[in-house]
C-alpha cells in the first residue's frame, strides 16, 4: 500500500484537501483526530499529560483544556517538546495500526507536524498543501478566533514554509478557488493510484 503523507502549515488547507481525497474513496487518517481520541478523559495519554503539566490543564469535567495547554506549550519550547514526547509516539503507533487495516491502493495520513517530528520516513510520498503565510494567518484568525500574534507563534514552532516545500514530493497550492483545488486533487489521485499499482 502506498502511504501519502499530507502536511502543511496551520491554515494552509490540509483538512480541505483531506476531505477531497476522502470524497474520492481514499482512506484518510487524521493525526489530529487520533490525538484528540487519545486525549479523552480516562485515556492513558491524558493522564500522562496531566501529570506532566498539572491538573490546571483539565477542565471541571475532566476534559483537556486545550486553550490552557496551547498557551503553555507555545510559550515555552521545552514544554512543547515534553508534550510531543508524550503524545506523538502514541499517535504514530495508532496511525501505523490504521494503515495496516486500510483498504484500497493507497491511503493518506494527514499529519500537520510530520516533518517537525522527524517522521518523513513514515510515508512513501510527501504532499504539502501550501499558501502564502498572510493567507494562513487570515484563515486561522477567521476560523479559530486566535489573535494574529498567537497564529504567528504557532507558525514559528512549525517547520518553515521553505523547508516544507523543499521536502515535498508533491505540492498543492491552495490560494485560489475550490475548482482549481479539486482539479489538483484529481490529478494527484490518478497519479497515486498509478504509483500504487506499479
From Swiss-Prot:
EC number: 2.7.1.24
Membrane spanning stretches: none
CDD domains: DPCK
Subcellular location: Cytoplasm
InterPro entries hit by this protein: Depp_CoAkinase, P-loop_NTPase
Primary enzyme class: transferase
UniProt-listed Pfam families: CoaE
GO cellular component: cytoplasm
Span of domain DPCK: 3-198
Residues holding ATP: 11-16
GO biological process: coenzyme A biosynthetic process
Lineage top rank: taxon: Bacteria
Principal location listed in the UniProt entry: cytoplasm
Catalysed reactions, as listed in the record: 3'-dephospho-CoA + ATP = ADP + CoA + H(+)
A molecular function (GO) term: ATP binding
Family, as annotated: Belongs to the CoaE family.
Protein name: Dephospho-CoA kinase
Species the sequence originates in: Methylococcus capsulatus (strain ATCC 33009 / NCIMB 11132 / Bath)
Designated gene of the protein: coaE
